[in-house]
């Protein structure tokens, strides 16, 4: 028994020695053992003598998936007079749990949930007051609009309807960009619209009265900042802006802007128009903010046109409006006995109907309209 144990103990060292010898042999065959991973000291592998088989490129095109929007909170801020109807505003939060409203009655003598220090500067006083009072509790997105639901300066393809614009507005687009003018159509306001410090005889003074005072106002509002040679964005003082973008400017500056509005000798119309062409500079730093109309519609509202069809639509609409003008002129001059004029009116109306039919066909082919 003792001899067997002695043989076992003698065999263990021999076995260990054999294993060490074997690994030393392998090490000599495969290169030095790596004791640390210093990549720079590692020798480069020689190029393969036979090229590897390269997989064929996948030529199938996969369009990007739809943008997933998070449920951003939004507040619709409205400036209104007592007699203006804002029932359309009241109904919107009922359909959207992430939307609230703040309707400011600027000419009310009674206590109201939202009010302003003074009815001055049109919607500007409301917008600034809302930002000042809610600076630390803003929704993700603030939407600033006028009181009227249907108006000419709203978007054509949303039936000029403020409620439809709010419903279709894509929150992610505002969160990504910080600021969006709610009007997609460039005219009036873009491009090359207001030229501060121009001569008194300039056409700008006749057509854009705020051009005569905006240079002076700029110097008061932004002392030390050079006055841009031109200021442009689509009219008419309606926009959406993210909370992050608003807070890039200290609250104290908004207070100073409102103090300027309270103190300025400019009348309401002019002080409001001055700010109409300042908001975009304030929130984007761009003197001219004139996005491509089809991009605004598609990314801002989900209404996506073929650019050629978009241009064709407005070409046809221009022709239709010209004929409609002729009809109105003939109708104002015609008498019941004027058969020739009556026939001409009928002919023009028929052409107008045909053009409207073509416009409807384009709208029917456009993604997002009517949804």
Q: Model features per residue range: what roles?
A:
Residues 2-371:
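ER/Golgi luminal nucleotide-sugar-dependent glycosyltransferases, focusing on the catalytic module
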């Amino acid at each position: 028994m003792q001899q067997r144990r002695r043989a076992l103990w003698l065999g263990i060292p021999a076995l260990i020695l054999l294993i060490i010898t074997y690994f030393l042999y392998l090490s000599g065959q495969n290169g030095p053992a790596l004791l640390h991973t210093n990549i720079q000291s590692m020798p480069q592998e020689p190029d393969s003598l036979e090229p590897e088989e390269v997989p064929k490129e996948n030529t199938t095109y996969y369009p990007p998936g739809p943008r997933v929007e998070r449920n951003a909170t939004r507040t619709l801020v409205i400036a209104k007079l007592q007699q203006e109807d804002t029932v359309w505003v009241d109904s919107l939060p009922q359909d959207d749990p992430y939307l609230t409203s703040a309707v400011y009655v600027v000419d009310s003598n009674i206590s109201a949930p939202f009010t302003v220090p003074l009815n001055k500067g049109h919607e500007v006083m409301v917008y600034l007051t809302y930002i000042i009072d809610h600076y630390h509790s803003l929704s993700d997105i603030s939407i600033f609009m006028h009181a009227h639901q249907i108006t000419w300066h709203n978007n054509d393809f949303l039936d000029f309807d403020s409620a439809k614009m709010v419903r279709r507005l894509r929150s992610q687009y505002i969160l990504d960009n910080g600021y969006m003018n709610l009007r997609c159509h460039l005219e009036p306001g873009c491009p090359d619209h207001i030229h501060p410090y121009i001569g008194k005889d300039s056409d700008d003074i006749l057509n854009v009265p705020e051009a005569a005072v905006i240079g002076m106002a700029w110097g008061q509002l932004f002392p030390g900042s050079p006055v841009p040679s031109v200021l442009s964005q689509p009219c008419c003082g309606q926009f959406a802006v993210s909370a992050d973008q608003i807070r890039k400017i200290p609250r104290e500056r908004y207070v100073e802007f409102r103090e300027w509005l309270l103190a300025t000798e400019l009348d309401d119309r002019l002080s409001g128009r001055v700010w109409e062409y300042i908001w975009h500079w304030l929130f984007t730093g761009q003197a001219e903010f004139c996005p491509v109309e089809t991009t605004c519609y598609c990314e801002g509202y989900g209404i996506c046109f073929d650019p050629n069809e978009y241009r064709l639509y407005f070409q046809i609409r221009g022709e239709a409006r010209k004929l409609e003008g002729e009809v109105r002129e003939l109708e104002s001059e015609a008498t019941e006995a004027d058969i020739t004029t009556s026939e001409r009116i009928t002919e023009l109306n028929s052409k107008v109907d045909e053009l409207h039919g073509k416009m409807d066909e384009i709208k029917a082919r456009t993604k997002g309209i009517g949804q």
